[in-house]
């Protein structure tokens, strides 16, 4: 009897999650059609919290929302998940474009404090501009940033650096000893595949289309 009750409760919980998944997916679709990306992102986060298996469309809408909000690393991660379901030409080309034009950076102030991130030349591409703007705002508020930035020259907390695709860059700036020798700056670089491949694997090839 106890086992039957437990199974019944489990089935009810699963049905409830499935219904909630359907509801959120429909809302995401409607918001995406209107290009209300902040709303899409909020609903996508709710969807992730359900712990259900996301569909290809869920992941693609999530990727577009992350890109529109300047979170290129989030966009890449969601595209990569989508590619495991369906490796379309659009998905793979977008992943390669990110790998070829962005670099992975981690910027840290010790202790954390709001600081300044500036770029030498504002990117022409709107997605790249949005990514830069999002990073600048986050650094101003938090003094730290970890994610993808467009390739180019930047200055973080007075420390110049260059973002290059295929190179992971970590910069740690501390104000200690500022009165005597200036700020302590630690810079470390690590090779990556492209930039967005967080596990070192290159994007998959598109699935051949049937003739």
Name these PLM-found stretches.
Residues 1-211:
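Acidic, Pro/Ser/Gly/Ala-rich intrinsically disordered segments
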